[in-house]
Amino acid sequence: MARYTGPKTKIARKFGEAIFGDDKSFEKRNYPPGQHGMAKKRGKKSEYAVQLMEKQKAKYSYGILEKQFRNLFEKASATKGVTGEVLLQLCEARLDNVVFRMGIAPSRRGARQIVSHRHITVNGEVVNIPSYHLKPGDKVAVREKSKSLEAIERSLSNSSHVYEWITWNNDLKEGTFVSVPARLQIPENIKEQLIVELYNK
């Protein structure tokens, strides 16, 4: 499955929640997509369908392809801790996600573009791999020549989210990935245990 680049609201309506963040269009049309969306009832789904839907929601939320997501699950399974929680922690430690959380980009899709276009450094070195995994203590910054980019400045000026596991200095346009977030510090509405059950079948 290729990375989805179509209308975000359509996908959000499929899951019944704004999985990509604030979405005014979703708020106006909070029902399944399609010609008979308003008439459709979210009927009872099979256990497999519920588990699959949760996995798809996580993949769309973080913008991760199936192969990458499966690899993250395998890594989480081999790591000490609760597998589902570790899986989400690995997703949160991706560079594109941290760039999004820091407010450098308004969405993870935008964060991937910023990283891919070489606007971000990690510990002083340019990193253009969105899936790059950060370690506690890593410093993430906007590249010097990119600090005046309108898209970045606009995103930072509109950002109001504060997370305990990252710091951000808006004057220097740099921050630190302080620690791996605990599950309670991850705001995503994902039932990770359903994903674990699906992959363990």
UniProtKB/Swiss-Prot annotation:
Looking at the keywords, is Metal-binding present?
Answer: no
Keywords from the UniProt entry: Ribonucleoprotein, Ribosomal protein, RNA-binding, rRNA-binding
Instruction: Please list the residue ranges annotated as the S4 RNA-binding domain.
Output: 93-153
SMART domains recorded: Ribosomal_S4, S4
Which cysteines share a disulfide bond? none
The alphabetized list of GO BP terms reads:
ribosomal small subunit biogenesis; translation
Q: Which GO terms describe its molecular function?
A: rRNA binding; structural constituent of ribosome
Q: Which domain of life is it from?
A: Bacteria
Q: Which GO terms describe its cellular component?
A: small ribosomal subunit
Subunit structure comment from the entry: Part of the 30S ribosomal subunit. Contacts protein S5. The interaction surface between S4 and S5 is involved in control of translational fidelity.
Q: Which PANTHER family match?
A: 30S 40S RIBOSOMAL PROTEIN, SMALL RIBOSOMAL SUBUNIT PROTEIN US4M
What is its biological role?
One of the primary rRNA binding proteins, it binds directly to 16S rRNA where it nucleates assembly of the body of the 30S subunit.
- In which family does this protein belong, per the annotation? Belongs to the universal ribosomal protein uS4 family.
**Per its record, how is this protein called by name?**
Small ribosomal subunit protein uS4
- Name of encoding gene: rpsD
